Amino acid sequence: MNFPRLLRHGGLLLWALAGAISVPAANPIGLLPANPRYFTFRGQPTVIVTSGEHYGAVVNRAFDYVRYLDTLAEDGLNGTRVFLAYREQPGAFNIAANSLAPKQERLVLPWARSAEPGYFDGGNRFDLTRWDEAYFGRLRDFVKQAGQRGIIVEANLFSCFYGDKSWETHPFHQRNNVNGVGQCAWDEALSLRDPKLVGFMDAYVRKVAAELRGFDNVTFEICNEPYIGGVDMKWHDHIADVLAAALRPGPGEAAANLSATHPTTHLISWNVANGTAVVTNPHPALAQFNFHYATPPDAVKQNRGLNRPIGDNETGFRGTNDAPYRMEAWDFLFAGGALFNHLDYSFVAGHERGNFAYPKDQPGGGSPKLRVQLGFLAGFLRTFDLGKTRPDTALLRGGVPAGVSAEALVEAGRRWAVYLRPASLSAQFSARWTGTLTPTESGEYTLHTVSNDGVRLWVDGRQLIDNWSDHAEQEDSATVRLVAGQPVPLRLEYFYGGGQGVTRLSWTRPDGTKEIVPASRLSRAGGQPGLRGEYFSGTQLQLGPRVLERVDATVNFPWGTDGFLGRQARNPATQLTVELPAGRYVAEWFDPVAPKSLGREEFSHPGGMRPVAVRQVGEETVLRLERQ
């Protein structure tokens, strides 16, 4: 028999389910009664933290979901999102090896094929009056396998359409079914205009609810991104009514939500917006509110009055590196979020262990390393009693170190935690270096910049390089005549939008020697060595706040994901001042990148402000305080 393995990350003990089969509880995942901003699952307060594939695990028969679910469980993650009746065409959104774009012969959907050819990319058209039992067998097994590993499945019933190409793949499109429905434009399909089409949608919703209501590890989302593509919110409310009726508790069944008028056995969520929006007058059956690309975590802060779980349910479009998404996760969950789901492009068919080497222009990231880091975050949150836990930055009244942003999470009277990261939100930043360049010999020089992302260079008041765009690492060059010993003004500007950052300034001298422009050739006002370096939050230089000014001897920065607070420039003696009640405490610092503990200390405190030395100001740092 396989028992759960106990893993240690520094001072944290984490459970990794190594194929262990959990016995389902009587009630499905629901709202935590003591604090309905979080979940309860199998008798335990729960936060959902995951890094999941691109939603095609069921509709793509080429995808080995057992291997995929094993990987999530081994990494300490407990959620996955799956689209039940939607596919994309290859190349959509520039996604390589998209698991949601299966080949036609590997596609399986809820409806059976008819005897008539004509589906848009081959195969027979669909008969919307008949179910494909092989599909529902695959769906049930997927949810069962997830449940055995303690993984919660979000079953997404519909998705908006993004244009003609996404609409023409769907069985509801008039050319893809034999039932005479779907004779409408892509931005009119998810509406109440065609009662016959709506009837097929209703039947599909009831069928899925009937198939999945026996599982305790399922939540339902009505529609992915209904704020795009003409989705009618009256239609959205109608589907909520149909689903709520199909999930109405029977004799002896408990309600997962807290609605007096629309009790349901399972939670139903609304995908509210990209970024943030203030939720007002939600449908009474909706008990969970999800956002996409929710950084900074304003969606949580603006909707605390809902007293319901808030999720950051899709990430991406911020480069392929781990750092932006790791910071997004810690920020969002420390702000009081209940769900974080990173869209992980390292999972594709044939690479269900999450080791696909996607191209640099993939619209997001994902990696084994990031999943371990997110598993560490999940384990960290499990050390808190979520029934008593709230975000509370009052802990930080004493201020935070310069150039640093912080979120704080507090278990009343018992535990306090602070997450510190560079103040440059989303890890995006811009920089300007100014000074003078003094050549060693007269002649024609070639100036070279290596950058990822944008770069601009002026020498002696003339712009030589202008590549102010989001691009992969590349070199740009320009020539200029310089006179030995004669200093000329130099200005170099750069922005980092995500991914693997790099900035280098080199030259090829008249004798053909190519090198980084040496520190001895660069100076500031008054002839002082080095360039003035100014660093700004965001990608637009002075439009974002300046968070750091320093002297840089040369411009030779393989930033990677470290950003301008690169580890070589961090100050280990920085102090954080926190406000605590009287008591005896154990303080422990963690590095969420390694991830590991950085050490512990004990102290007694009479109450009030208390300075605590930061063990490491790295890309991110976490402090946990426990009152004994």
Protein language model annotation of sequence segments:
Residues D476-V480, L576-T577, G608-R615:
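Exposed aromatic-hydrophobic patches
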Residues Y325-L425, R570-E602, A613-Q628:
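Aromatic- and carboxylate-lined catalytic core of secreted/periplasmic carbohydrate-active enzymes
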Residues P24-A26:
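Boundary at the C-terminal end of the N-terminal hydrophobic targeting segment
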Residues G10-S22:
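Bacterial N-terminal signal peptides
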Residues R42, W458-G461, F590:
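Short strand-turn-strand beta-turns centered on an Asx-Gly dipeptide
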Residues A34-A285, P297:
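Active-site mouth of glycoside hydrolases
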Residues A402, L425-P572:
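Acidic/polar, compositionally biased interaction segments
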Residues N281-G354:
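Catalytic-core region of carbohydrate-active enzymes that cleave or remodel glycosidic bonds
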